[in-house]
Amino acid sequence: MAKRGGFPGGNMPGNMNNLMKQAQRMQKQMEDKTKEMEEKQWEATAGGGAVTVTVSGKKEVVSVKLSKEVVDPDDIEMLEDLIVAATNEALRKMEEESASAMNSIAGGLGNFGGLGGLF
């Protein structure tokens, strides 16, 4: 007669303990990586280096640097476009590296319940 309850293949308490330990390790790794990423900064330029924007891992703009040549009072729109482009590129770099870092940790899930693709 088949046993009811429990997981196929046996020792449920041991398997659950191992899963919990693995989940706790992974949570700690993700917390550590998140703190590490928040302390980092990413930089991007636009207009051939005329505009440089630096963002943090907290998704905050840290600095905007403009070369004198790009500041034209008669063409403010171009300057605005360059700032937006550099900011978006810096944020894209940050997001890409953050996602890659989290996927390297979450990859251990092996798409467990579809969670492996969350990051």
From Swiss-Prot:
Listed GO CC annotations: bacterial nucleoid; cytosol
Classification via SUPFAM superfamilies: YbaB-like
Subcellular location: Cytoplasm, Nucleoid
Region described as Disordered: spans on this chain: 23-45
Record key words, sorted: Cytoplasm, DNA-binding
Stored Gene3D superfamilies: Nucleoid-associated protein YbaB-like domain
Bias (Basic and acidic residues) ranges: 28-42
Principal subcellular localization: cytoplasm
InterPro entries the UniProt entry points to: YbaB-like_sf, YbaB/EbfC
Keyword ATP-binding tagged: no
Tagged with keyword Cell division: no
Single annotated GO MF: DNA binding
Entry's family note: Belongs to the YbaB/EbfC family.
Record's subunit section: Homodimer.
HAMAP family registered for this protein in UniProt: DNA_YbaB_EbfC (MF_00274)
Function recorded in the entry: Binds to DNA and alters its conformation. May be involved in regulation of gene expression, nucleoid organization and DNA protection.
Protein name: Nucleoid-associated protein Cphy_0047
Organism from which the protein derives: Lachnoclostridium phytofermentans (strain ATCC 700394 / DSM 18823 / ISDg)
Classification lineage: Bacteria, Bacillati, Bacillota, Clostridia, Lachnospirales
